Design a protein with these regions (language model features):
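A detector for small-residue-rich transmembrane helices and their helix-helix packing motifs
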Residues: 1-217
Length: 217
């Protein structure tokens, strides 16, 4: 990893170390550092930040860190470590904000149904409060947006399906898929709106930098 920029390298190392710590004491790590809904008994104020360093398994970690290495390294080379880290954490925290906001909307519907005596709604409320969210994926999607806006015509190759497309179309398609799967509640235990939030905050920050003429420094 000698050719990997410092900030990206340190992020990868920290994420890997947290994975090891989670394997050694999973219950403690999840209860303290995963992201819980604000009214959950397990919620702590630092979780919107710390959940970005936790992952649900080796492959979750691997694909996020691989994407960070490929695309984050290029952004850091252009921006420098400080600006890249600002972008990374703003998009990651923005992803957590969007994810929690969508959960809040779900909670309002369930609370109304529970007030009418719905047992299913009560179970949904309990499940939402007890279910943790982990992963750097929100920030990673922000990184993809940043790359696509800096290099819109760069060709990105998908592993599955094995096709190549320009970065601007890649990000647009991924965003549409995340929105569709989020709205239809398909795709398993994946925080689709967190991914979408990373894209949104990445776009907003890139537009702000573009208007302030600080996009490349």
């Amino acid at each position: 990893m000698s050719n990997v920029p410092a900030a990206v390298k340190n992020l990868i190392i920290i994420n890997a170390l947290v994975m090891v710590m989670t394997a050694l004491n999973e219950n403690f790590m999840y209860e303290k550092f995963a992201l819980f809904y604000p009214t959950s008994p397990f919620f702590h104020w630092w979780q919107p930040l710390t959940h970005m360093f936790m992952h649900g398994g080796f492959w979750h970690l691997f694909f996020n860190m691989y994407t960070l290495w490929i695309f984050g390294s290029q952004l850091e080379r252009v921006w420098g470590a400080k600006k890249f880290l600002l972008f990374y954490f703003v998009t990651g925290l923005g992803a957590a904000l969007v994810h929690t906001g969508v959960e809040w909307l779900q909670m309002q519907n369930w609370l109304a149904e529970a007030a009418d005596g719905s047992y299913a709604a009560q179970l949904s409320i309990h499940s939402l409060k007890m279910t943790p969210t982990v992963g750097a994926s929100g920030a990673i999607y922000g990184v993809l947006m940043g790359y696509a806006m800096l290099y819109p015509d760069a060709v990105m190759a998908l592993v599955f399906p094995p096709i190549a497309m320009k970065a601007k179309w890649f990000v647009l398609i991924f965003g549409a898929v995340e929105l569709l799967t989020g709205l239809t509640e398909t795709g398993g235990n994946i925080a689709h709106f967190a991914h979408l939030g990373g894209l949104i905050f990445g776009y907003l920050l890139m537009m702000y930098w573009r208007k302030s003429r600080t996009l490349y420094y």
